């Protein structure tokens, strides 16, 4: 019989794929695979939601009209205007990439976070009964690999635009001559600025992961309670969690815009 701790552990375990002795293995066989383990559920759901985002926006763009728009077109236009205003208010450089990037980050993370509102046993149990999959996590942002992948992409853009706008020399000066503008403090400046630079992707990823992981864990704990108390607890928490879902996507987007704006500042 599955215990409470076993139930929690089961729902927090990813569907894994790895290579063992030259052949592909899954789940239990990947216990000792270490770094070279693929979380295939996180990959499938994140890519699938990304494709859904592209498909919906593409279809809306194709059917866009200057007349009376439909409900979906109104929603997409409001979302695009919201992101566009956020970029105009926070980004002070010139780049046609930032607004589409911010829109992609916000909508993609929002879709991945929204998966947390699906009942915790619904999709995993269906996958187990139909496909025989023993483990399945449906919320990609509760997987640190996904959140770190997103934040490392942002980090790469920060470094790229810093070098592009300021040049190699300007980027090195930024790391070595701030905050103390004296050659004697170059080692101290380099350590402080390097830590500050590396802290950006780490804080981005851990903030998103921590909030969604905690939310998922609370849903799992509620599912362990007697049936008569589940509705009384799950509905209020789901309503509150909607705020968390939207807020975390917004924070990730805004910090990305701010960091890239800082990278475009030419001192």
Swiss-Prot record:
Xref: SUPFAM superfamilies: F1F0 ATP synthase subunit A (SSF81336)
Chief location: membrane
Keyword Ion transport: yes
Entry-linked InterPro entries: ATP_syn_F0_a_bact/chloroplast, ATP_synth_F0_asu, ATP_synth_F0_asu_AS, F0_ATP_A_sf
CDD domains according to UniProt: ATP-synt_Fo_a_6
An example Gene Ontology biological process: proton motive force-driven plasma membrane ATP synthesis
Superkingdom per UniProt: Bacteria
Keywords on record: ATP synthesis, Cell inner membrane, Cell membrane, CF(0), Hydrogen ion transport, Ion transport, Membrane, Transmembrane, Transmembrane helix, Transport
Mode of membrane association: Multi-pass membrane protein
Location of this chain's protein in the cell: Cell inner membrane
Cellular-component GO terms for this entry: plasma membrane; proton-transporting ATP synthase complex
Transmembrane residue ranges: 38-58, 98-118, 145-165, 208-228, 238-258
Subunit structure: F-type ATPases have 2 components, CF(1) - the catalytic core - and CF(0) - the membrane proton channel. CF(1) has five subunits: alpha(3), beta(3), gamma(1), delta(1), epsilon(1). CF(0) has three main subunits: a(1), b(2) and c(9-12). The alpha and beta chains form an alternating ring which encloses part of the gamma chain. CF(1) is attached to CF(0) by a central stalk formed by the gamma and epsilon chains, while a peripheral stalk is formed by the delta and b chains.
The protein's role, per its UniProt record: Key component of the proton channel; it plays a direct role in the translocation of protons across the membrane.
Family: Belongs to the ATPase A chain family.
Protein name: ATP synthase subunit a
Gene: atpB
């Amino acid at each position: 019989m599955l215990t409470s701790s076993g139930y929690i552990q089961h729902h927090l375990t990813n569907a894994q794929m790895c290579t063992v002795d030259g052949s592909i293995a899954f789940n239990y066989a990947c216990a000792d695979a270490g770094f070279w383990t693929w979380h295939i559920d996180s990959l499938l759901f994140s890519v699938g939601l990304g494709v859904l985002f592209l498909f919906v926006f593409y279809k809306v763009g194709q059917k866009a009209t200057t007349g009376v728009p439909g409900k979906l077109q109104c929603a997409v236009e409001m979302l695009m205007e919201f992101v566009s205003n956020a970029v105009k208010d926070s980004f002070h450089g010139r780049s046609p990439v930032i607004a589409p990037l911010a829109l992609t980050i916000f909508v993609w993370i929002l879709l991945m976070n929204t998966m947390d509102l699906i009942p915790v046993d619904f999709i995993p149990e269906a996958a187990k009964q139909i496909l025989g999959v023993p483990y399945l996590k449906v919320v990609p942002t509760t997987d640190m690999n996904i959140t770190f992948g997103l934040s490392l992409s942002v980090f790469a853009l920060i470094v790229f635009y810093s070098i592009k706008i300021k040049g190699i020399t300007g980027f090195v000066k930024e790391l070595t001559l701030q905050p103390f503008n004296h050659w004697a403090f170059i080692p101290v400046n380099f350590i402080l600025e390097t830590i500050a630079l590396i802290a950006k992707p780490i804080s981005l990823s851990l903030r998103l992961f921590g909030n969604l992981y905690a939310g998922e864990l609370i849903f799992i704990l509620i599912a362990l309670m007697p049936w008569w108390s589940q509705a009384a607890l799950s509905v209020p928490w789901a309503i509150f969690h909607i705020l968390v879902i939207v807020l975390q996507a917004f924070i990730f987007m805004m910090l990305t815009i701010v960091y890239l704006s800082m990278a475009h500042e030419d001192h």
